[in-house]
From Swiss-Prot:
One of its GO terms (molecular function) is phosphomannomutase activity. It is an enzyme of class 5 (isomerase). NCBIfam families: glmM (TIGR01455), PRK10887.1 (NF008139). Catalyzes the conversion of glucosamine-6-phosphate to glucosamine-1-phosphate. It catalyses: alpha-D-glucosamine 1-phosphate = D-glucosamine 6-phosphate. Binds 1 Mg(2+) ion per subunit. This is Phosphoglucosamine mutase. The keyword Phosphoprotein applies. It comes from the Bacteria. One of its GO terms (cellular component) is cytosol. Pfam families: PGM_PMM_I, PGM_PMM_II, PGM_PMM_III, PGM_PMM_IV. It comes from Shigella flexneri. PROSITE patterns: PGM_PMM.
Length: 445
């Protein structure tokens, strides 16, 4: 059992100005990470960020801490999280650091690390960094202090990497695509990738100002994208979240296409092309419709705990190459080491171009079960609502009523004081009623 104090399921995250997302904490974090990670010869760390205004402050703090530990910082500027993972590998850096709170509002921020091979740090390394933070900061000799520099061609490098995951013999020239970059880190990457592959691109959510990241745009709110797809009579829409590790799509009729459907399309295309290795990994939240659709194709399916790090662990355990969360994290280990929204989107576009099929038609082989997800906020430190007898009783009643034609899942958020209530079944009205019954029970605790 991990006893990490600061690191959550996706690094360290919180409201800017409140512990732990403060300049002094982040400076010490940089120093502690530098002490732990300085094990090889390069002594350099890649630092990327999304478009939050607080990114400037936090990257300066990290730089100071790393320099004190004798490590040099290479800044990418605003860059998608998977791009930092990629650049960490190609530069042979000790590690990569991303300053982002992903899909959260601008006033939150976070720090997450990538190892030298572009994967998330093991728990043991995070625990070692936390242990180092209990010590007093000590500065290396002046001659050994770290330096700072910028990778001026970081964006171009990642654009070329993304394009290389799309087959040379295909083109997007017949497609009109609306792309929504959430006013986040993909704003200068995704539109260029799609244009250079031949698409007619209409870009929205590409004017970051430091405070508008994820604000009524992006993968967590596709209403603007849906409206624009319909208004432009586009073939599809593609939305990323603030740091570009998630992708959600919209078909030409304005229907939202979730991560489960995206993985289904990619897995089925892999099967058709003969390069699917093993099965596909989802999570406890993955729709039953995905499991049934993959089963009909003869593709094995396994569920991991919620969180892309757990999806990756399950993929590695089974030796499989495809995994996803319904929220839009899609991991394709034959192409990337982490969730990469642009790359995942390109694989769906590959299936469209190769088969001359619309996104709507590609989704038609999978029937999504009605699923309700309700987030219920509780007071941190007031006890665990999931352990309350009244909540357990109502949950048991609902599970009995659904039988084997539905599912109930209650879990705590890894980053916020929220209980996530998920109910899934064949009848939408029944699912909604059951979700509200459980939600009311949690609120009453």
């Amino acid at each position: 059992m991990s006893n990490r104090k600061y690191f959550g399921t996706d690094g360290i995250r919180g409201r800017v100005g409140d512990a732990p997302i403060t300049p002094d904490f982040v400076l010490k974090l940089g120093w502690a990470a530098g002490k732990v990670l300085a094990r090889h010869g390069s002594r350099k760390i890649i630092i990327g960020k999304d478009t939050r205004i607080s990114g400037y402050m936090l990257e300066s703090a990290l730089e100071a801490g790393l320099a004190a530990a004798g490590l040099s910082a290479l800044f990418t500027g605003p860059m998608p999280t998977p791009a930092v993972a990629y650049l960490t590998r190609t530069f042979r850096a000790e590690a990569g650091i991303v300053i982002s709170a992903s899909h959260n509002p601008f006033y939150d921020n976070g720090i997450k690390f990538f190892s030298i091979d572009g994967t998330k740090l093991p728990d043991a390394v995070e625990e070692a960094i936390e242990a180092e933070m209990e010590k007093e900061i000590s500065c290396v000799d002046s001659a050994e202090l770290g330096k700072a520099s910028r990778i001026v061609d970081a964006a171009g490098r990642y654009i070329e990497f993304c394009k290389a995951t799309f087959p040379n013999e295909l083109s997007l020239s017949e497609l009109k695509i609306v792309v929504d970059c959430a006013n986040g880190a993909t704003y200068h990457i995704a539109p260029n990738v799609l244009r250079e592959l031949g698409a007619n691109v209409i870009a929205i959510g590409c004017e970051p100002n430091g405070v508008n990241i994820n604000a009524e745009v992006g993968a967590t709110d596709v209403r603007a994208l849906q409206a624009r797809v319909l208004a432009e009579k586009a073939d599809l829409g593609i939305a990323f979240d603030g740091d570009g590790d998630r992708v959600i799509m919209v078909d030409h009729e304005g229907n939202k296409v979730y991560g489960d459907q995206i993985m289904y399309i990619i897995a089925r295309e892999g099967l058709r092309q003969g390069h699917l290795r093993g099965g596909a990994v989802g999570t406890l939240m993955s729709n039953m419709g995905l499991e049934l659709a993959l089963k009909q194709l003869g593709i094995p399916f396994a569920r991991a705990k919620v969180g892309d790090r757990y999806v990756l662990e399950k993929m590695q355990e089974k030796g499989w190459r495809i995994g996803a969360e319904n929220s839009g994290h899609v991991i394709l280990l034959d192409k990337t080491t982490t969730g990469a929204g642009i790359v995942a989107g390109l694989q769906v576009l590959t299936a469209m171009a190769r088969n001359h099929m619309s996104l709507h038609d590609l989704c038609s082989g999978m029937k999504m079960f009605p699923q309700i997800l309700v987030n219920v906020r509780y007071t941190a430190g007031s006890g665990d609502p999931l352990e309350h007898e009244s909540v357990k009783a109502v949950t048991a009643e609902v599970e009995a009523a659904l039988g084997n034609r539905g599912r109930v899942l209650l879990r705590k958020s890894g980053t916020e004081p929220l209980i996530r209530v998920m109910v899934e079944g064949e009848d939408a009205a029944q699912v909604t009623e059951f979700a509200h019954r459980i939600t009311d029970a949690v609120k009453a605790v």
